[in-house]
Regions:
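Conserved SAM/SAH-binding beta-strand->alpha-helix loop
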Residues: 82
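Class I SAM-dependent methyltransferase "Motif I" SAM/SAH-binding loop
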Residues: 57-60
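Class I S-adenosyl-L-methionine
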Residues: 175-225
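Conserved beta-strand signature within the Rossmann-like core of class I S-adenosyl-L-methionine
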Residues: 157-164
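A short glycine-rich, Lys/Arg-flanked "PGG" loop and its adjoining helix->strand segment in the class I
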Residues: 142-156
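S-adenosyl-L-methionine
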Residues: 1-52, 62-69, 90-117
């Protein structure tokens, strides 16, 4: 049995994108062109923001919404494959009349390849799908190619925040960032990665982990070359 026989990625996405409400369907249709890959280059023409943050796989958009509301002078970009999450965040963006968020629907790697060199100040990868089965590891967002593109698109001294409650993908991601010569792991001692920064916003998945007495991994990598 080959990989495509064993797992249909399109069916997986379809199952996650079901049950859109009428309002969610309507707002997705309205913003269809603005959240497409073709419109990504338009972001880079925006010059009024001094700090630009990208979140890969923002889920329901809790962090993006929180940050955009609290830091109106920063630009926040989000990429997601989950239509329901995009739609819900679009509704919240309209509700709060936010101008400092840009959203994109699709594959994060495709967007990273489109980004300008030395463009982003930070990249967030918060509790990504761990794809626990070995045959699905190729689906993990962190790999050699994506880390290279992350490095290229980040400014010097830019940072990557990578949080997860899954041990397998924690060490998987750590390995790829450590092996990339551009990044330094911002840590004093190894166990520091199990301590969260109190000021950080607690996401839905982080909250679930903490309620189960699971201490997530909190990684910060700095681009130093």
């Amino acid at each position: 049995m080959n990989y495509s026989d064993d797992f249909n990625f399109n069916n997986y996405l379809s199952s996650r994108n079901r049950s859109l409400t009428k309002d969610q369907k309507s707002i997705l249709d309205f913003y269809q062109k603005k959240i497409s890959l073709e419109s990504f280059c338009e972001i880079e023409k925006i010059e009024e923001y001094n700090y630009i943050s990208l979140e890969i796989g923002f889920g329901t958009g809790d962090i993006l919404l929180h940050n955009a509301l609290n830091f109106p002078n920063n630009l926040f970009i989000g990429i997601e494959y989950y239509k329901k999450g995009i739609a819900q965040l679009l509704l919240n963006i309209e509700k709060h009349n936010l101008k400092n968020i840009r959203l994109f629907y699709g594959d994060a790697f495709a967007y990273l390849k489109q980004a300008k060199t030395n463009y982003l100040d930070e990249i967030l990868i918060m509790f990504p799908d761990p794809w626990p089965k070995k045959r699905h590891w190729k689906r993990r967002i962190i790999n050699n190619n994506s880390v290279n593109e992350i490095s290229r698109s980040l400014k010097l001294n830019g940072k990557v925040l990578f949080y997860t409650d899954d041990k397998s993908i924690a060490f998987w991601g750590l390995r790829y960032f450590i092996l990339n010569k551009s990044f330094t792991w911002a840590i004093n001692k190894p166990l520091d990665c199990r301590k969260r920064t109190p000021s950080n916003y607690i996401t839905k998945y982080e909250s679930k982990a903490l309620k189960k007495n699971i201490d997530p991994y909190y990684f910060c990598f700095i681009k130093e070359q």
